[in-house]
Amino acid sequence: KNFLINIVRYLPVSACYIISMTCSYFGVRFIEESISDPIENTSGAVVPILCAIFLHQTMSAWAIVVVVIIVIGILGVGFVENTGKTDLKKKLGKKLAIWAFAMPFCYALLDACGTFLDIFYVDDASSTFLVGVTEDTIEHMANCCYEFTFFFISIGILIFFKIKGVKLFSVADPTNEEAIAHEATLTWYQKVYLQKDKLLAALFETMGQATYIFALSEGEGIAAVILGAGTVIISVILSRVILKEKLSWKQYIFIFIILGGIIALSLLGL
């Protein structure tokens, strides 16, 4: 009973995280992961600003300088991404280019709002909105509420697709009749296996979320450095090695400016 109540009470936080991820998945279809991921991880720079505005907390002079550096990096990436050979407007059209490039920023803002709201839910078990939790269980309860909310939404979307007659787990080219005919002979678990890359991605995402909660609740300050900077570094490396993304030297300069700002902001929290 308490768990269902907590799912409802934690819904504002879950909504911020889930909608932010939806924005991320939409944007990554059109923008290189090497660019979108550093922008998305600047959500850590937005949280102190929200705390300063709504909780009247003060930011140190160094924190303000770092936030300004991150903003400069973001503006630089935005300028380079929309000029010269990397002009998104030429590749996608003006309207879609605006929507695509806005998605990483939407993710950063919504993720920051989710993190900000988490302060009211997991900071103190005696004053939390969640019921039936202790200092030892509050983070785990919050994580379970988020994961099950995501699960229930996925079930709802699955039912909606079935009603609309959308072909689930289809990988066949809709213009290739032979491929469509072959796919029709496959069993449901064979079709699911064809989506193994997405299943693996979902597994990593879920494990990452659990690790994120544990690291912040149980780890030392260095965890913030690893989480804030490590994800960006690994993402840029994997995008270059596996996805074969090639960026201009100007883009890399501004990306490393953002990365440096994220590392500095994490270190300030030590």
Where are these regions (language model features)?
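Transmembrane alpha-helices of multi-pass small-molecule transport proteins
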Residues: 1-19, 69, 139-180, 234
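Residue-level recognition of pore/gate-forming positions within transmembrane alpha-helices
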Residues: 41-45, 67-70, 74, 150-153, ...
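Structural motif at transmembrane-helix junctions in multi-pass transporters
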Residues: 23-39, 126-130, 137-140, 210-230
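Hydrophobic transmembrane alpha-helices of multi-pass small-molecule transport proteins
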Residues: 50-52, 61-82, 250-269
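Hydrophobic/small/kink-forming positions within alpha-helical transmembrane segments
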Residues: 14, 18-22, 45-49, 108, ...
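C-terminal transmembrane-helix exit sites in multi-pass transporters
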Residues: 24, 45-65, 214, 232-252
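Juxtamembrane helix-loop-helix junctions in multi-pass membrane proteins
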Residues: 110-152
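Loop-to-transmembrane-helix transition segments
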Residues: 1-23, 40, 98-108, 169-211
